[in-house]
UniProtKB/Swiss-Prot annotation:
It comes from Cyanidium caldarium. Belongs to the universal ribosomal protein uL18 family. The keyword tRNA processing does not apply. Binds 5S rRNA, forms part of the central protuberance of the 50S subunit. GO terms for molecular function: 5S rRNA binding; structural constituent of ribosome. One of its GO terms (cellular component) is chloroplast. This is Large ribosomal subunit protein uL18c. It is found in: Plastid, Chloroplast. GO terms for biological process: translation. The keyword RNA-binding applies.
């Protein structure tokens, strides 16, 4: 699946990872094999606004912050990579939050 994303889309990739305790989002440049930016519930700006770091509110804040940072870097269009997670719950909330703050995918 990742190879399909790399070959079909020459765009940045928004990778979402959920652990039992935290929510992570990264913008990856697959052409140059580097991570452009990374935001998680461990990021000080996000962590200071949360009391619980593994719920939908946390996912919403991570989506908002990753979209703001991406727009600061001049990144508007991304490919959404949810990994093996279903597009439901925290993944869906993060995606909708990133979309509402200006990312297009």
């Amino acid at each position: 699946m990742i190879n399909d994303i790399k070959q079909l889309h020459k765009r940045y990739r928004l990778l979402v990872h959920l652990s039992n305790n935290h929510v992570y989002a990264q913008i990856i440049d697959d052409l140059n094999n580097r991570t452009v930016l990374s935001v998680s519930t461990l990021t000080p700006q996000v962590k200071s606004k949360l009391s619980i770091t593994c719920n939908k509110k946390a996912a919403e804040l991570v989506g908002e912050y990753v979209a703001q940072q991406a727009l600061n870097f001049g990144i508007r269009n991304v490919v959404f990579d949810r990994g093996r997670k279903l597009y439901h719950g925290k993944v869906e909330v993060l995606a909708n939050s990133a979309r509402s703050f200006g990312l297009k995918f």
